[in-house]
């Protein structure tokens, strides 16, 4: 739908908690890296070890719960070893500095660009980023961050994926099944203005009523492309494999 990740684009991936924002971004980054791209990931919430574990399980098709609890099988270890070899051959650089600023991201990405090239930047996530200023107005801070990142994307000629959390708006919106809209973006004005692409993630199972087994087991992920500066908006349907923290394509598209 978006014709791949376009250079110099600022791409916002947003959703409520537990929608799979980090997993989605890691899947995109990992797929690009396995095709030869050089990726810089800035994780302000999760550690490098946690991200690597997620990527390994997604690539190996191994249940992450078994890895976390130390209950892996011999077959799991073989798959994980193969996945580790594949990932070790990629150019994925993870920076898990807490509270990293836009200025620090700019400096590190410039160095990587000049040293060994750079094809994609992923930042997880917007709320935890610091700005150079000392504004008490969060909307102003968000505006500074998104504008600076858009400038950086153009300067380095690479796409930047920025994760963001949505407000509680979808929780009370029952008429459309709690699907998010752009207005649910926190401090949405600045984000809408600076972003080239805005993707809103939605999983119906998160809002399933207790006891509705079919709804609870629905693994559909809707990627709602709410803004696309250079193309159409639409919804892309994926399958969410929670045990592997992985998304896969699906051939069927369900109307709602």
PLM regions and their residue ranges:
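Cytosolic-facing regulatory segments adjacent to core modules
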Residues: 23, 27, 31-117, 131, ...
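The Walker A (P-loop) glycine that initiates the GxxxxGKT/S ATP-binding motif of P-loop NTPases
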Residues: 15
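Pre-Walker A adenine-sensing motif
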Residues: 1-4
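Conserved ATPase-coupling elements of RecA-like P-loop NTPase cores
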Residues: 130-137
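Pre-Walker A (Motif I) flank of P-loop NTPase domains
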Residues: 6-11, 37
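Conserved glycine(s) of the Walker
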Residues: 20
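C-terminal regions of RecA-like/P-loop NTPase motor modules
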Residues: 101-118, 135, 144-157, 169-256
């Amino acid at each position: 739908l978006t014709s791949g990740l376009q250079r110099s684009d600022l791409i916002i991936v947003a959703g409520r908690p537990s929608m799979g924002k980090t997993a989605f971004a890691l899947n995109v980054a990992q797929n690009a890296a396995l095709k030869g791209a050089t990726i810089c990931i800035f994780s302000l919430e999760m550690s490098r070890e946690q991200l690597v574990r997620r990527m390994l399980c997604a690539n190996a098709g191994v249940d992450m719960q078994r890895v976390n609890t130390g209950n892996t099988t011999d077959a799991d270890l073989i798959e994980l070893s193969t996945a580790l070899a594949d990932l070790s051959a990629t150019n994925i650089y993870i920076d898990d500095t807490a509270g990293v600023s836009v200025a620090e991201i700019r400096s590190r990405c410039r160095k990587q660009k000049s040293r060994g090239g750079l094809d994609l930047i992923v930042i997880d996530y917007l709320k935890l980023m610091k700005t150079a200023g000392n504004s008490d107005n969060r909307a102003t801070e968000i505006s500074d961050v998104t504008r600076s990142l858009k400038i950086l994307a153009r300067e380095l000629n690479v796409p930047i994926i920025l994760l963001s959390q949505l407000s509680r708006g979808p929780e009370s919106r029952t008429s459309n099944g709690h699907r998010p809209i752009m207005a649910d973006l926190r401090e949405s004005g600045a984000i809408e203005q600076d972003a080239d692409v805005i993707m809103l993630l939605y999983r119906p199972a998160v809002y399933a009523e207790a006891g509705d087994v079919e709804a609870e087991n629905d693994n559909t992920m809707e990627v709602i492309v709410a803004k696309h500066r250079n193309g159409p908006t639409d919804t892309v349907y994926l399958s969410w494999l929670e045990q592997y923290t992985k998304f896969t394509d699906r051939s069927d598209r369900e109307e709602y």
